[in-house]
């Protein structure tokens, strides 16, 4: 339950903004942190051309055709790399890969061969690095690119799908920290 004080008549707990007032960047970021998200590393290229970044915004868009959406900061190296390559790979991390998430979320993350070595992956059929122990890896071809405020949204057609049934639990980010899914039993 929120500790905010309601500012308008009829406001409910946690809903304290006057109508028409947009949230600030920090407030919106904190609010979105309440939404648990899976954690993935998006990769482009391999070898000297490897670029990678951690994302918490991967969305299944369509089953037929298989489409996913990823959201990337518009000023990042990965946007240009995807534009050049015409595609990307999405690697959903396990709880044992939180170190990779932290590494590729930093501004001084490795790229080129250093990124490929740190990821410990192999190039897939698309030429993009796939993480060996990821819960799921998808090789995608860019279908569309959309501006989205300070981000770019890439809609990717999934050409190759790699699942690791024996992989550990997926890494989850919630309230600014990594967490795990609880076993329902």
Swiss-Prot record:
Top class in the EC scheme: oxidoreductase
UniProt entry keywords in alphabetical sequence: Antibiotic biosynthesis, Flavoprotein, FMN, NAD, Oxidoreductase
EC number: 1.5.1.42
Superkingdom, taxonomy of origin: Bacteria
Protein's GO biological process: antibiotic biosynthetic process
GO molecular function: FMN binding; riboflavin reductase (NADPH) activity
Record has Flavoprotein as a keyword: yes
Residue ranges, annotated region (Disordered): 1-24
Description of the deletion phenotype: Mutant produces asukamycin in considerably lower yield than the wild type strain and accumulates major amounts of protoasukamycin.
Catalytic activity: FMNH2 + NAD(+) = FMN + NADH + 2 H(+)
Pfam families, sorted: Flavin_Reduct
Compositional bias of kind Low complexity: 1-13
Transmembrane region(s): none
Biased composition (Basic and acidic residues): 14-24
Pathway the protein takes part in: Antibiotic biosynthesis
Alphabetical list of InterPro entries matching this protein: Flavin_Rdtase-like_dom, NADH-dep_flavin_reductase, Split_barrel_FMN-bd
Purpose: Involved in the biosynthesis of the antibiotic asukamycin. When flavin concentration is low, AsuE2 assists the protoasukamycin 4-monooxygenase AsuE1 by providing a reduced form of flavin, enhancing AsuE1 activity.
Family note: Belongs to the non-flavoprotein flavin reductase family.
Subunit structure: Does not interact with AsuE1, suggesting a possible transient interaction between the two enzymes instead of formation of a stable complex.
Descriptive protein name: NADH-dependent FMN reductase AsuE2
């Amino acid at each position: 339950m929120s500790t905010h004080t309601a500012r308008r008549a009829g406001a409910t707990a946690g809903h304290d903004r006057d109508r028409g007032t947009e949230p600030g960047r920090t407030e919106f970021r904190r609010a979105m942190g309440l939404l648990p998200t899976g954690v993935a590393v998006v990769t482009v290229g391999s070898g000297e051309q490897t670029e990678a970044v951690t994302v918490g915004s991967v969305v299944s868009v369509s089953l037929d055709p298989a489409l996913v959406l990823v959201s990337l900061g518009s000023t990042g190296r990965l946007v240009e790399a995807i534009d050049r390559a015409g595609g990307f790979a999405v690697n959903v991390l396990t709880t044992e890969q939180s170190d990779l998430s932290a590494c590729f979320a930093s501004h001084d993350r490795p790229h080129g061969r250093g990124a490929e070595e740190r990821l410990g992956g192999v190039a897939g059929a698309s030429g993009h690095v796939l993480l060996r122990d990821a819960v799921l890896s998808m090789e995608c071809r860019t279908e569309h690119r959309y501006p989205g405020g300070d981000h770019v949204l890439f809609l990717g057609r999934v050409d190759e799908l790699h699942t690791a049934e024996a992989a550990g639990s997926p890494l989850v980010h919630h309230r600014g920290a990594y967490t795990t899914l609880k076993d329902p039993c």
